[in-house]
Curated annotation (Swiss-Prot):
GO terms for molecular function: DNA binding; DNA-directed RNA polymerase activity; zinc ion binding. This is DNA-directed RNA polymerase subunit beta'. Binds 1 Zn(2+) ion per subunit. Belongs to the RNA polymerase beta' chain family. RpoC2 subfamily. It comes from Synechococcus elongatus (strain ATCC 33912 / PCC 7942 / FACHB-805) (Anacystis nidulans R2).
Amino acid sequence: MAEAKSAPIFRNRVIDKKQLKKLIGWTFAHYGTAKTAVVADDLKALGFRYATRAGVSISIDDLKVPGSKAELLESAEKRIQETEDRYTRGEITEVERFQKVIDTWANTNDELTDRVVKNFRESDPLNSVYMMAFSGARGNISQVRQLVGMRGLMANPQGEIIDLPIKTNFREGLTVTEYIISSYGARKGLVDTALRTADSGYLTRRLVDVSQDVIIHEVDCGTSRGLFVEAMTDGDRILIPISQRLLGRVTAEAVLDPSTDEVLAEAGQDINEDLANRIEKAGIKKVKVRSPLTCEAARSVCQKCYGWSLAHAQMVDMGEAVGIIAAQSIGEPGTQLTMRTFHTGGVFTGETARLLRAPVAGTIKLGKKARTRPYRTRHGEEALLAEANFDLVLEGKGRKETFAILQGSTIFVQDGDKVAAEAILAEVPVSGRTKRTVEKATKDVATDLAGEIRFQDIVPEEKTDRQGNTTRIAQRGGLLWVLAGDVYNLLPGAEPTVKNGDRVEVGDVLAETKLTTERGGTVRMGEDNGSSTHREVEIITASVVLDTATVKAEASQGREHYVIETKGGQRFNLLAAPGTKVTTGHVVAELIDSRYRTQTGGLLKYSGVEISKKGRAKAKQGYEVTKGGTLLWIPEETHEVNKDISLLNVEDGQLVEAGTEVVKDIFCQTTGIVSVTQNNDILREIVIKPGDVHVLDDPDTAAKYDEGRLVNAGEEVFPGLTAEQLVWAEAVDGTDGPLLLLRPVQELVIPDEPPVPSQDSSQESSSRSIRLRAVQRLQFQDGERIKSVEGVDLLRTQLVLESEEGSSQLSADIELLPDSKDPETLRLQLVIIEPVVIRRDVASDTTHGSTHTELRVKDGQKVKPGAVIACTQIQCKEAGVVRGIQEGSEAVRRLLVERERDCVTLDLDVTAATQLQPGSLIVAGTQLVDGIIAPESGEVRAIAPGQLQLRIARPYRVSQGAVLHVEDKGLVQRGDNLVLLVFERAKTGDIIQGLPRIEELLEARKPKEACILARRPGVAHINYSDDDAIDIQVIEADGTQADYPVGPGQPLIISDGETVDAGQALTDGPANPHDLLEIYYDYFREQLGEDYEAALESLRRVQALLVNEVQSVYQSQGIDISDKHIEVIVRQMTSKVRIDDGGDTIMLPGELHELREVYNSNNTMALTGMAPAQFTPVLLGITKASLNTNSFISAASFQETTRVLTEAAIEGKSDWLRGLKENVIIGRLIPAGTGFKAYEESLLTDVDGGYEDRVYDDDLADVVIDDRAARSYTLNEGRDFSRSMTFAEGESMILDDGEELIDDSSASLRNLVDVDED
């Protein structure tokens, strides 16, 4: 090649990024790495040298704004104004207006971008900005557009497009509003990028984990299977040409030229670039090639099925870790994929629909076959929708043009219309993957003016859902009018004081609300709380006051509390603080009384005391005493210890003095006999019982006092001992023998009725009276032992609030009142209050009008139940006529005053206009009489000679199926929601794009709204029932019929009578891959009658779907990834089956096994005549597949470490260390690259001669071959995979090869050289 004789040819061409790629690729393919590096280096030097010379940089003068920008914007503004006018006239709905505005701006933006480029190209091709962007050095067209065109439409944080575009560019500068809108979108971009990197990194990690053990292990697995490769298309566009998909593949069968039957490629031949181009030129649509998906090599992929290594453009080496390369190739572009597509509110560009334009002026003819129905486009324009395929004919001057109209096309012309050249005739949807699918969306419409509602042509229909909520839906669309007027919101409970048709002046009362008292009582004006909206009036319905007792504030331990002192010298603690509320039965105060306080714990006995039965349950409060008597109290000191027995310093039954340390750190306070309770060497409690001790000789006496009993004064205890006072005699075991203990008893007397301070109560109404009652409550029951060291209160005397009604729960306020005679003295008062809230006067507030409130009572006045306390009036703000009070409706919530300025008077001769009568509604722009058009929309009020009075109104278009929020003749305030428009918004392709979609595919997730799939092939019939439900019947070849009910909102994508295949989608939406696999498997098992083949075929279908779906996501973002990478990953996801029935094999139902493992085991079973295993193929997501690998070390290092390891331990698994990850973790040489074959079993045969005479121990210490040992084995016995390249003498020089290098369309080496697109 170097010695070629011909002189080099010089070509003067522009070489941009794409050409550069090709140049380097070409050099690499023909001359290898070293020379390519030199060429690249030289190019770099050249580039830098000239970049330095040229000094290209952007200055503000380089940003040239095209002169035609102003007129472009002007025409756009004009179109938008027209749209706004149509909206104001009620010709289009809010949604259609929005769509039209967005589309107008999007088109303007595109048009402007083209002008910018054209402007540069024609007037200043050496402009720095232009050169940078178009050579691919820096920047792209959309950035240039923002610099010198317009910034365009931005999305708000919810992803909806803001219909105010940024019309300026960065050169001119943004206005404040534009700047804020602009930063919305910019921030969103940044956040997206930040989220994207994390997501993408995790995706890469999962991919690496699932495929890390795929290594090229053998040369040829010998399979005859393969995949058919065809060009990848999207509608009419070719995304990936067949030549590009074939490059670097190995053919599975011979490729023949269809026209000449010449053999283009043998079976098993790898396809290089020339061959790929020849196949494409020959017009071959499908080629069967080997693929990692069909490779039969166990646990890996063979060289032939993988094909070229794309880095070297030659067959892949043995031991190449293709799994990891695949994972990185898919994961790396992840960051470039957009996270979410902006929900553009249905802005879609021209790619989803082809516009048919008239080539010449002429007349339209729709033939006899044309089946169309009227259709309203998304911009609210009237058009026709084709219901079947037919031809549209345009007859021009001397020529006839025919256009094929497909079903579903939108036709913008009628039969017989005359059209100009370049007029748009129709919009033909593009068939193929991007079906123009729709989703339901809603939009609220709020009114711009207050007034009265009128329906015109709207037929409302009430629908009740399962929960019983009623919604009103417009069955027929029409206009919803709002007739202007001043609307007043009435306060709750207000009654109108005027009638429809009354004339009112400013300040007249329109409605009033009366505030009444429910129970009556004494009026007390609250202090003014300073609130601007209301004040409170209190009505005291009942009260009680302690008229002789005084209340004092005392401070104890730094806390202030109140004490009530009675004339009798009793002192009560006030428990409820002043200003709080207490309910019936609540304790208000408690007597301060030390008579019933003990020194220590002890035993309590009742003598004649009775307690209330019902109080027993409420032991929290204590037990209420119903009859007085005496309490008998036998003191004893109890320590609850719960410590180790070794800490005890005294013995059971020992006599101790007060102050003795009975247990470590515990001292007793009384003198007496110790009683110790212990349990399992744990000291539970110590009781010290005081009293007189007597030694007992007689065991009978001991038995008599064993339980302990009361001995009255003067009674004989035992012979020779008489009790001097009331005692409690109890026998105890002393340290030296039995003792009798006589314990002192204290007697406490309880009176029948506790003393109560005098009280004076005032009752306003007979129904309520309240008083304070004194209650004595015992804290402990008869015979209870109180374990305590300190003293306890045995009885409390409390003041409790009571009401006559007994049952009802009243709440009273506690207040302190200064005495009327002596202001220094405070008295306790309890009052029951009914609060009445009175609104303040509000100066003319927008919705209520002026309210004026007047009080009808004075402080201290007594009022009867039902008396009016205050009255609030709504006053008129502007003179006019009252309207809109609906007769017969329950409560009137709003009323309307029609003012002078809500009407306009037109001077015209009305006699000519016959169609006008009072009450008819006219849209602005309507011709009233010849030459006079209505300036405003409105309702005809009155017709007088020479005059027409219009009431201003505003029409809103309501589409069919919208949800109505208002009723006919109802009243609305400005800003109220009138209607919720339900519309269909076009989506292009899948809504989920980018990373989330890839993740959904590779994790094999069930899509949210999956489509309905046909389970068996047949002919589809579509039945529409009454309630919009659709039923699809598929009638199979043998006449069986399957029903598929379709839910609401699932658009069909098949037509009536169409033939469908098994697994074909009947409705729109992404397919659920799991269902698809199941459907295919059932179908093929029936067709082929063999499980293994059926599983392979069904898996192959799902694999193809996954590969294409992933490819299409990357393609839509303009990223090229070779199919084989995706195939390697998908192979790992689809290699397992679930066992349904183990048969006679050792497999268990529910286990996951490799398909070929099960196949081999079933073959063995067949030979021996035993039952094979039944199985179903499964599709595993990448995470699940990673956790189900054979290597537990790899799985555990990925996720759920503990679960994986415990499972492996229980099953006693061994890890064969086949993948890279396991070996890395253990620290061995990885079995790829140079380490490949170091661990192959075959090595044991060809060991180096020098090793043969060694004698080895039978039980080697280390089973794992060590790296050092592995090195000494001969590794050069394998095949030689390097290849030499020679070039024929006549091959062309580098710049001499005609069009090949510079031609854009040949995407020859795009795959080989991965240069970053950005």
